[in-house]
């Protein structure tokens, strides 16, 4: 089983960590090509392109300027520790043991507008570049054109080494669109997380994002490789709901939060 996650907008480069053997991004040379395009932009261009405040635009122009082709522990941080949004709050890497993190390194991939795809322990320099950004580049009008089949090919090679190749899609639609699922030659499972509110079950964005991280955590903690075992997911009160589930879209529900 291979999990794909979205990245997060929020980053944490302040909290110190200890990682014995960080790795390097597979597509660092491709990232450098995008950085070259981003370095051409003034703060007002970045603000308009990414719908950012002037303050955030200035921050990210500085990040593009300082980005280096050489990744070190001084200018980078392993991706799974650097991302700090709802998904990563649910995943809570800081409380995982070494064996779980080792499993994650082999079975979790983070999709990224700048880096294409990252392993959890890949060193990552701070950036802001969402996959849906219409950044013109050497390959086309946006990042989907830039990455083309590269990310898909990377995941396909990895899935080809697994006894039971299955892709567990815990990424957002914006990021999953960078993949060509039919080319992966394996089942794709996309769980649905619903919370009770006002007597009805519905997808609530904040809770659903966190639940994706929780499920990724559940998989790596329990070394799950068989999709059938996902039905046991029970973190934070979620339970498998068979009546509304499909093989490729299992539904997990939770009672209303009080």
From Swiss-Prot:
One Gene Ontology CC term in the entry: cytosol
Any one GO BP annotation for this protein: response to hydroperoxide
InterPro entries assigned: YaaA
Domain of life of the native organism: Bacteria
Family indicated by similarity: Belongs to the UPF0246 family.
NCBIfam families assigned to the protein according to its UniProt record, in alphabetical order: PRK02101.1-1, PRK02101.1-3
Protein name: UPF0246 protein Pnuc_0753
């Amino acid at each position: 089983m291979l999990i794909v996650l979205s990245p997060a907008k929020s980053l944490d480069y302040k909290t110190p960590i200890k990682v014995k053997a960080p790795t390097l991004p597979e597509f660092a040379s491709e990232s450098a090509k995008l950085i070259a395009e981003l370095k051409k932009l003034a703060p007002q261009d970045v603000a308009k392109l990414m719908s950012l405040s002037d303050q955030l635009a200035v921050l990210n122009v500085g990040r593009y300027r300082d980005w280096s082709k050489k990744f070190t522990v001084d200018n980078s941080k392993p991706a799974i520790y650097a991302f700090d949004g709802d998904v990563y709050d649910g995943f809570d890497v800081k409380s995982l043991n070494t064996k779980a993190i080792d499993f994650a390194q082999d079975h979790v991939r983070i999709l990224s507008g700048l880096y294409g795809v990252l392993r959890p322990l890949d060193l990552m320099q701070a950036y802001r570049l969402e996959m849906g950004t219409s950044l013109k580049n050497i390959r086309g009008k946006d990042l989907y054109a830039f990455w083309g089949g590269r990310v898909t090919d990377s995941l396909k090679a990895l899935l080809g080494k697994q006894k039971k190749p299955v892709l567990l899609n815990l990424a957002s639609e914006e990021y999953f669109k960078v993949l060509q699922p039919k080319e992966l030659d394996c089942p794709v499972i996309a769980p649905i997380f619903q919370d009770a509110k006002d007597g009805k079950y519905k997808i609530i964005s904040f809770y659903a994002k966190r639940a994706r991280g929780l499920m990724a955590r559940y998989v790596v903690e329990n070394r799950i490789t068989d999709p059938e075992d996902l039905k046991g997911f029970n973190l934070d009160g979620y339970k498998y709901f068979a009546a509304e589930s499909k093989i490729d879209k299992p539904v997990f529900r939770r009672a209303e939060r009080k």
